[in-house]
Regions:
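Extracellular/lumen-exposed scaffold segments
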Residues: 2-5, 17-130
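Hydrophobic h-region of N-terminal signal peptides that target proteins for export
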Residues: 10-18
Length: 130
């Protein structure tokens, strides 16, 4: 089965006021690929997109979507959702460490391109919006 997953990421920097002047910012910044590792597999009739999230990073629950060319793709999320107080979004649900998107009836997407979009941050340093 062949399903293409395209990731949508943009990039901007938020420099924290709490960083010490003695710490090099460049040594602390991770790329989006280092912060969020994505794996795709099939399990029975489910397509599973696993995201391993760096220990200093997180993904906003409300800024996560999966679409094909025509519509939103329905999925279940498996992961530990917690809430943080964010200076830009206020009280925000996020995922840390890992999460899985389980897409039922994966046969529906054979030959289609799925677009995964998400927004996440490296704590107090940089955000990677989708």
């Amino acid at each position: 089965m062949q399903i293409k997953i395209l990731l949508s990421l943009s990039f901007f920097i938020l420099i924290s006021h709490t960083l010490s002047e003695n710490i090099s910012l460049s040594s602390k910044i991770l790329t989006a690929e280092e912060s969020f590792k994505i794996f795709v597999k099939e399990d029975k009739n489910n397509l599973i997109i696993s995201m391993k999230i760096n220990e200093r990073s997180y993904i906003y629950s409300d800024h996560l979507s999966l679409k094909d060319s025509n519509q939103d793709v329905l999925y279940d999320i498996i992961g530990n959702k917690i809430f943080i107080t964010d200076e830009f979004y206020g009280e925000s649900p996020i995922y840390k460490n890992s999460l899985e998107l389980r897409i039922p009836d994966s046969y529906k997407y054979i030959g289609k391109v799925l677009y995964l979009s998400y927004q996440g941050c490296l704590e107090n340093i940089i955000c990677y919006p989708g």
